[in-house]
Design a protein with these regions (language model features):
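Membrane-interface transmembrane helices that cradle and orient dolichyl/undecaprenyl
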Residues: 107, 143-159, 169, 187-192
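Transmembrane-helix signature of polytopic, membrane-embedded enzymes
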Residues: 3-9, 97-119, 137-138, 152-158, ...
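Short helix- or helix-capping micro-motifs
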Residues: 13-16, 110-121, 125, 138, ...
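Membrane-proximal stem/loop segments at transmembrane-domain junctions that anchor or position
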Residues: 224-314
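Membrane-embedded glycan-lipid processing machinery
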Residues: 21, 56, 60, 71, ...
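Short hydrophobic/aromatic helix or loop-helix immediately within or flanking a transmembrane segment
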Residues: 35-45, 55-77, 311
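Membrane-interface anchor segments at the N-terminal boundary of transmembrane helices
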Residues: 80-81, 287-288, 294-366
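Transmembrane-helix motifs of polytopic, lipid-linked glycan transferases
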Residues: 84-105, 142, 146, 349, ...
Length: 415
């Protein structure tokens, strides 16, 4: 195998992102940060994985914070370090898409699909800003590639690698909690060894998650992946539908009366006043989880409306635009209004046509994964950023459709 396709894919992924990085360099660490950035800074200054020194937190999905910590430690908190390293991750993602297509379809389909997937206008902008989906993309492709390899080669050590990869994906996005079961369902068969491989996958995933869960019990007070069930409540309460329908996001849902501070708010308060606000994360986790279950039980009709709304927001070809966002009214909005819909509509149409041209196991796995993302969105919330890490599956199908049409035309011209 020559290196030329790898170089092409790497260049296509890197060049536009480098251009965006240079244009956006002043905003990388100011206008578009998230709570993982705060946690990384506190950890490096005090050794506490939290928002307030000496007060550990589980109020987040921890993977992205752990990704930022070594970057800040080695290179300081600099826009170029975050941007360049995240571009490297995006390049790695594109190369994995190429490898997936090359192995399961053809080299040319893999090459074009990797280029199509990495040129998603939404990703080109977001990949250089601080957002945890940069890791979701890489891990998503790795999971699909490893699962497809294991489906044809029953390797226990590869099963362990897949298990750890799934655990990392869950630590980055708890919406993927049940993904290991889906992967194992595609691995098991009549042969006894397939069940052994599936067992290794589940064991590897569980063992990789245990340290974080135990840490939360010791440091925070409860066995959990994250205590932030308030995010689930924001997506499941009587005010959610109207808030989202008004063009806002779940963060704009009105808080409860006399609501106690969140760990994130406590961190911001500590920065300004130097005082520690008491926060019982485990009690809050149980409280908001109870409210969510109560809402589902008492308002099934409202929940059905929210599920439909979330599905549309997940699959809307036009990237979700919420009021009050930092980039409102600028060039990013122009991309959302014109470039993103043009890209997404073409991708979706060709993907539907091309799914029948992919190898059966890959096509079925891809459809199931996208259906899983839709079901999770119906339970939580839907947004473009939750879907795009998996758009490479659609890009593979779309490219297969294009090449099928090209080959058919060539055969007709020869005949």
């Amino acid at each position: 195998m020559t290196r030329r396709p790898w170089l092409i894919v790497a260049a296509v992924a890197a060049v536009p992102r480098l251009a965006v990085l240079l244009v956006e360099r002043r905003d990388i660490l100011t206008a578009f940060t998230e709570k993982s950035d705060d946690i990384a800074q506190v950890f490096l200054k005090t050794g506490t994985f939290g928002f307030v020194p000496g007060h550990p937190t589980a109020w987040t999905q921890p993977l992205y914070a752990w990704f930022l910590i070594p970057i800040y430690w080695i290179f300081d908190r600099s826009w170029w370090a975050v941007g360049v390293i995240q571009i490297a991750v995006a390049v790695g993602t594109a190369l994995l898409v190429y490898e997936l297509g090359r192995r399961l379809v053809s080299q040319r389909v893999g090459l074009v699909a990797a280029c199509v997937a990495t040129l998603n206008p939404y990703l080109i902008w977001h990949d250089v800003h601080e957002n945890r989906e940069i890791l979701d993309q890489f891990l998503a492709v790795a999971i699909v590639l490893l699962t497809m390899i294991l489906a044809g080669r029953r390797s226990l050590w590869l099963g362990a690698v897949l298990g750890v990869t799934l655990a990392l994906a869950i630590l980055g996005n708890t919406r993927l909690l049940f993904l290991p079961l889906i992967c194992c369902a595609f691995l098991v068969g009549r042969e006894q060894r397939t069940w052994a491989v599936a067992g290794v996958v589940l064991a590897g995933c569980a063992l990789a998650l245990v340290p974080w869960v135990v840490r939360n019990k010791v440091s925070v007070g409860c066995f959990t992946l994250t205590t932030d069930t308030r995010a689930l409540w924001k997506a499941n309460n009587p005010n959610t539908y109207a808030t989202l329908a008004a063009g806002k996001w779940i963060d704009d849902v009105p808080p409860l009366p006399n609501e106690p501070p969140t760990p994130e708010f406590a961190g911001a308060y500590y920065k300004v006043y130097g005082k520690v606000l008491p926060v019982d994360e485990c009690a809050r986790m149980r409280f908001y989880r109870h409210l969510v279950f109560q809402f589902w039980r008492d308002h099934p009709g409202e929940k059905a409306k929210l599920a439909g709304q979330a599905s549309w927001m997940l699959w809307d070809p036009q990237a979700i635009r919420t009021e009050g966002r930092a980039e409102s009214g600028g060039a990013v909005d122009v991309l959302r209004e014109w470039a993103q819909p043009a890209y997404s509509i073409a991708l979706f149409v060709l993907g539907i046509l091309g799914v029948w041209l992919l190898p059966g196991r890959l096509a079925l796995f891809g459809v199931v994964l996208l259906a899983y993302q839709t079901l999770v969105a119906m339970g939580f919330a839907g947004a473009t950023r939750y879907r795009v890490p998996w758009d490479f599956l659609i890009a593979l199908a779309a490219t297969a459709a294009v090449w099928w049409a090209i080959d058919r035309r060539r055969r007709r011209s020869v005949a």
